[in-house]
UniProtKB/Swiss-Prot annotation:
Example of a GO cellular component annotation carried by this entry: cytoplasm
Annotated transmembrane regions: none
Chain positions covered by the region annotation Phosphoribosyl-AMP cyclohydrolase: 1-114
Protein known as: Histidine biosynthesis bifunctional protein HisIE
Pfam families documented for this protein: PRA-CH, PRA-PH
EC numbers on record: 3.5.4.19, 3.6.1.31
Compartment(s) where it occurs, according to its Swiss-Prot or TrEMBL record: Cytoplasm
Keywords: Amino-acid biosynthesis, ATP-binding, Cytoplasm, Histidine biosynthesis, Hydrolase, Multifunctional enzyme, Nucleotide-binding
Similarity section: In the N-terminal section; belongs to the PRA-CH family.
Pathway connected to this protein: Amino-acid biosynthesis; L-histidine biosynthesis; L-histidine from 5-phospho-alpha-D-ribose 1-diphosphate: step 2/9; Amino-acid biosynthesis; L-histidine biosynthesis; L-histidine from 5-phospho-alpha-D-ribose 1-diphosphate: step 3/9
C-alpha cells in the first residue's frame, strides 16, 4: 500500500481530483482495466483491500465486483514518477471484464499472461477424471511418474540442443516446461514461487 509520504505527494490538483488508476494482475502481469479514483475512493481501497473507483457517470464510489462478486483484491499500489497516476497490483476473483474476459483489453494477452492461464488450467485438472485428459491421467499416476517425465523431457531437451535442431529443441523445451508446471502444481507450488526465488538470488 502507499506510504503516508506517497499519499501526501499525490498531485490531485493536476488531474482535477480524478486520478487514473491502472489495474494489473499481480502474478501474470496482465493489464486488467483502467478507472479513476478520487481521494475518497483511494482511501476506501486502502482500507478494504478491494479496488474502488469513482464513477464519472453515476457520480459516486463503486467497488469493482460489488454486483458481480468479481472483486479485485489489492496486493500493492504504486504512484508513477509524476505522482498523477496509480498502478494497482491485484489478485482478481473471476473475470475483470463485464464481457467475461480476464481483461477489459482482451485478447491482448502477453506471453506471461498465457503462461499463467495455462498454469490455472493445469491446476483445474488435478481433481478431474483421469480419463478426461492426459494431464488428469498424469496427476493420477502420482508424483514419481510426473517427476520421471520431467527428467525424461530434460534429457530430450538437452539432446536436441547438442544436435543444433532448433525446431526439435523448441518442441522438447515446450514438453519440459509443461511437465515442470504439472510437477509444481502436484506439489502445490506455482511458477511465481520459482520466479520469486530467482529474483531473490539475483538481488544478492
Amino acid at each position: 500500500m502507499l506510504t503516508e509520504q506517497q499519499i501526501n505527494q499525490l498531485d490531485w490538483e493536476k488531474v482535477d481530483h480524478l486520478m487514473p488508476a491502472i489495474v494489473q494482475h499481480a502474478v501474470s502481469g496482465e493489464v486488467l482495466m483502467m478507472g479513476y479514483m478520487n481521494q475518497e475512493a483511494l482511501a476506501v481501497t486502502e482500507k478494504t483491500g478491494k479496488v474502488t473507483f469513482f464513477s464519472r457517470t453515476k457520480q459516486r464510489l463503486w467497488t469493482k465486483g460489488e454486483s458481480s462478486g468479481h472483486f479485485l483484491n489489492v496486493v500493492n499500489i504504486y504512484p508513477d514518477c509524476d505522482n498523477d497516476t496509480l498502478l494497482i497490483l491485484v489478485k482478481p476473483i473471476g473475470p475483470t471484464c463485464h464481457l467475461g474476459n480476464s481483461s477489459c483489453f482482451a485478447p491482448a494477452a502477453s506471453d506471461w499472461s498465457f503462461l499463467y492461464q495455462l498454469e490455472q488450467l493445469l491446476a483445474s485438472r488435478k481433481s478431474a477424471d483421469p480419463a478426461s485428459s492426459y494431464t488428469a491421467k498424469l496427476y493420477a499416476s502420482g508424483t514419481k511418474r510426473i517427476a520421471q517425465k520431467v527428467g525424461e523431457e530434460g534429457v530430450e531437451t538437452a539432446l536436441a540442443a547438442t544436435v543444433n535442431d532448433r525446431e526439435e529443441l523448441t518442441n522438447e523445451a515446450s514438453d519440459l516446461m509443461y511437465h515442470l508446471l504439472v510437477l509444481l502444481q502436484d506439489q502445490d507450488l506455482d511458477f511465481s514461487t520459482v520466479i520469486g526465488r530467482l529474483r531473490e538470488r539475483h538481488e544478492k
